[in-house]
């Protein structure tokens, strides 16, 4: 069975048992009344069952309801169909004030019907010939308004300075100021020029997201013809069906696939309604993607440390044990489905490098947009500063240093021999984002 953990807030006067049974019925075989065609099928075989209800600590009217769904309810290899049932009409049910899907346990038999990520972590490292450290990226800013040639120039400077990747912003598709084909051509030129100068393999996440699946595939095919290593998709706004098709194309044609999660906070940020990001991350691992943005813990966007580390384990590891202290409600066995590299992006800079290295480990992408392009000397020195800071943090971690305690000292020491890093340290020494997270663990 597929197991689901729902956070249920019933309307006043509705007992939790009734609310849990309603969730199980409405998201599987049930409707609002008894119908004569019920007698033509084996309801006991197909109906969802609410098998456990727990009160939420510290809340008077919230419950975690556990529901089991028979596997025969779902089409094989279709995240779209799975979500249509489990998070469909039931979320508008009048008997509930709010409903949130906290976690899913996907059985191994169902996992095996999915291709999953096009390549996975090890294959990506082998393609790039980069080992033993996080990868470095940069989102090109301003996100909208640059011409294709200026955009390509910004990519080249960042890649030449030492970054592994540059990135289209999620809302860069094919607008009047920069059509997609022009951007792809100038970015490919930037990649090849930077590779020739540095001797390293470089990439730019070319955003293939489009208004139709046919147009999306046309962009992916053009990227492959240019010989670039990686493309990108906005998987929530683009949709799971489009994403799965693109992931299959990427595996067949040797392209890495970077996934952006634009729109996720509409779904996952409120604590009592919607869907926790760990569910979206599991769905992405099944649908397919080699990278996905997972929060930073230390940057400008929402993300509590323990919850974020729970996402990261679910994305990368083959087997993840139940651990309620990190928001993981079920043990998940991925049966060798390739892993997804978590991407930390949003309001991060060189002072965050030791903390990011300690939190995310080697198998991650650390992405500095403003933290590269905001360098007072330009894009290439900004990239140099990030590469030096990463090298210093990775060397200190390998030598057994405590990055959480000694991080600032490590960066200060490295800045003594890197003027680019010293300038970056001076610019961002006062920048902090100190706000309480909205989506927190139950105490």
From Swiss-Prot:
Q: SUPFAM superfamilies annotated for this entry? A: RuBisCo, C-terminal domain (SSF51649), RuBisCO, large subunit, small (N-terminal) domain (SSF54966)
The cofactor note reads: Binds 1 Mg(2+) ion per subunit.
**Subcellular compartments:** Plastid, Chloroplast
Which cofactors does the annotated protein need, by name?
A: Mg(2+)
The active-site annotation reads 141 (proton acceptor), 260 (proton acceptor)
Question: What's the main place this protein lives?
Answer: plastid
Enumerate the GO terms in the molecular function aspect.
Answer: magnesium ion binding; monooxygenase activity; ribulose-bisphosphate carboxylase activity
Gene Ontology terms, cellular component aspect?
Answer: chloroplast
Residues at which Mg(2+) binds: 167, 169-170
- Looking at the UniProt record, the site noted as Transition state stabilizer sits at 300
Q: What InterPro entries does the record tag this protein with?
A: RuBisCO, RuBisCo_large_chain_AS, RuBisCO_lsu_C, RuBisCO_lsu_C_sf, RuBisCO_lsu_fd_N, RuBisCO_lsu_N_sf, RuBisCO_lsuI
Q: Which EC class is this protein assigned?
A: lyase
Q: Which UniProt keywords apply?
A: Calvin cycle, Carbon dioxide fixation, Chloroplast, Disulfide bond, Lyase, Magnesium, Metal-binding, Monooxygenase, Oxidoreductase, Photorespiration, Photosynthesis, Plastid
User: Per the UniProt entry, what is one GO biological process?
Assistant: reductive pentose-phosphate cycle
Q: Where does substrate bind?
A: 89, 139, 143, 261, 293, 345
- What catalytic reaction does the record list? 2 (2R)-3-phosphoglycerate + 2 H(+) = D-ribulose 1,5-bisphosphate + CO2 + H2O; D-ribulose 1,5-bisphosphate + O2 = 2-phosphoglycolate + (2R)-3-phosphoglycerate + 2 H(+)
Q: Which residues carry this modification: N6-carboxylysine?
A: 167
- State the EC number(s): 4.1.1.39
Q: How does it assemble?
A: Heterohexadecamer of 8 large chains and 8 small chains; disulfide-linked. The disulfide link is formed within the large subunit homodimers.
Q: Which family does it belong to?
A: Belongs to the RuBisCO large chain family. Type I subfamily.
Any additional notes?
The basic functional RuBisCO is composed of a large chain homodimer in a 'head-to-tail' conformation. In form I RuBisCO this homodimer is arranged in a barrel-like tetramer with the small subunits forming a tetrameric 'cap' on each end of the 'barrel'.
> What protein name does the entry list?
Ribulose bisphosphate carboxylase large chain
Gene that produces this protein:
rbcL
